[in-house]
């Protein structure tokens, strides 16, 4: 690729593929991998620009309202309710995971999944030293196990009923603190 193009190295190529996959444009990602250029390249470039603009807008909305964001230097709690939804939350998570500012933090993100449930996503970032599986197991003991989904060693999702939210938030902070202490 051209050294000045937006696919100039493997990192930028991976970012473009990630954008395509997050937007569920697998055909576009495959075409790029197979070497198609021209209109495919323009479509990918437009998608990346749209993605970047969306992430900037979401970030500024979330972090402008101080009550939505709490950071104790080890864990970041973000209330994305009303801003993030199931369509854009995974792109936002990908952005947070790659952010240098959060590279050593456990990220706890809350969105409204439906009228009855919140989705609480916990992400262990690159330099965070906490046993996320241990947290998932403790949550499963307190709340209904069927609502805890281990995505991988670095990400879990919990569906919490609206009526159990306050109880869950109180317990999740205690569980995280306990897990940090037990690892020390």
Where do the protein language model's features map onto the residues?
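Hydrophobic helix-and-loop "lid/oligomerization" segment in the mid-to-C-terminal part
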Residues: 1-132, 137-183
């Amino acid at each position: 690729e051209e050294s000045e193009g937006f696919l100039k190295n493997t990192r930028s190529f991976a970012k473009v593929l990630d954008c395509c996959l997050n937007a569920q444009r697998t055909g576009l990602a495959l075409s790029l991998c197979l070497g198609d250029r021209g209109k495919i390249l323009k479509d990918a470039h437009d998608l990346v620009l749209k993605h970047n603009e969306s992430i900037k807008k979401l970030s500024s909305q979330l972090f402008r309202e101080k009550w939505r964001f709490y950071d104790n230097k080890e864990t970041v709690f973000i209330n994305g309710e009303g801003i993030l939804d199931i369509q854009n939350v995974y792109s936002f998570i990908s952005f947070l995971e790659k952010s240098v500012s959060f590279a050593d933090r456990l990220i706890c993100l809350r969105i409204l999944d439906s009228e009855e449930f919140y989705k609480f996503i916990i992400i262990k970032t690159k330099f965070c030293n906490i046993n996320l599986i241990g947290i998932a197991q403790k949550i499963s003991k307190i709340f209904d196990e069927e609502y805890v989904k281990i995505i991988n060693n670095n990400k879990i999702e919990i569906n919490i009923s609206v009526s159990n939210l306050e109880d869950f938030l109180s317990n999740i902070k205690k569980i995280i603190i306990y897990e940090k202490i037990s690892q020390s």
